[in-house]
Amino acid sequence: MKVMKFGGTSVGRPERMQQVAKLITTGQESKIVVLSALSGTTNALVSIGEALAKGDKPLAKQIIDELEAHYRVFIKDLLKSEATLTKGEAVISEHFDFLNIILKISFNEALNKDILAQGELMSTKLFSAYLEERGIDHALLPALDFMQIDANDEPYFDAIRVKLNRILQQHTDKKLFVTQGYICRNSKGEVDNLKRGGSD
């Protein structure tokens, strides 16, 4: 099993995401492909959290709207078939509906971690839609189902190994897997992250 990690710049434009698809489909070995959020997304999500922490909901809303507009343009360049474009639009609507809902919720650090997770969740779902459009067989593995940190915020490798192996055994017919970098669950089972660069 080979692990291939692609950062935000590698998937930051539709043509780069398409190049990643070509790279990961060469050779016969099984691969787990780990993707970051599209470049600029995590910075925008951090800014949303900072604005909400200061009580500046109009600024948070402005950043959300600008980011959503960017994603709407992105998928139109990435996805060409009506079916996968519809799927891509549904992904964007799901995650930006969440970001708009949080404007009405009391802000706290746990909510901030949920905000920060949205970038990787979107990038991998959109990439999966592109692979599907190209007829590339794969499985999308949610990192939140197996990536875990301990009480010291360090990767809990034993738990990760057991959970990931269990998931892979459910997909013995697949040789290509896509998952998220950066995001994980903490020792309380809450959405958390490995900090910037931590997924490397």
Task: Give short role names for the model-derived ranges.
Residues 1-200:
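Nucleotide/pyrophosphate-binding catalytic subdomain
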